[in-house]
Amino acid sequence: MSYVENLRKYVGHQPVILVGALCLLFDRENRVLLQQRVHPHETWGLPGGLMELGESAEQTAAREVLEETGLTAEGLELVDVYSGKDNFAVAANGDAFYNVTIVYRANAYHGELMHEETESIQLAFFPLKALPEKMIGSHRRILNDFSEKE
């Protein structure tokens, strides 16, 4: 049972603060890797997820990339941290949370690209100027912010 599942047994749907990490991975054509997720509703998003007890944010990002894409991310560099009232959400099951999202960029990666079928439908690289329409809003904002800084 994950940390969040265990926590929810005690607090129910009450708002909690959850810490997670996302990772930007680019191919040789400078396209970003996105996954079409099963939840929420087949939207596209960046590889990433919630921190488990005892993990560093960097370890979380690397673990999630490996689990969701089959790739080993290397040379992670901090891009930005997103937090505050703009990062409040309520999941489909009614769980309320404030997300603290730590965004990394992988300078290199290796392995065979393959999606984990319980969490994602497919993986694909997209140009930053041609992101899919149906995308997790906060992930689109993160990529827009990143694109403006580059």
Regions found by a protein language model. Give the residues of each.
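Charged phosphate-binding loop/patch that engages nucleotide di/tri-phosphates or the phosphate backbone
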Residues: 140-150
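Conserved positions in beta-strands of structured domains
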Residues: 24-26, 79
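Acidic, metal-coordinating catalytic segment for phosphate/diphosphate chemistry
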Residues: 1-22
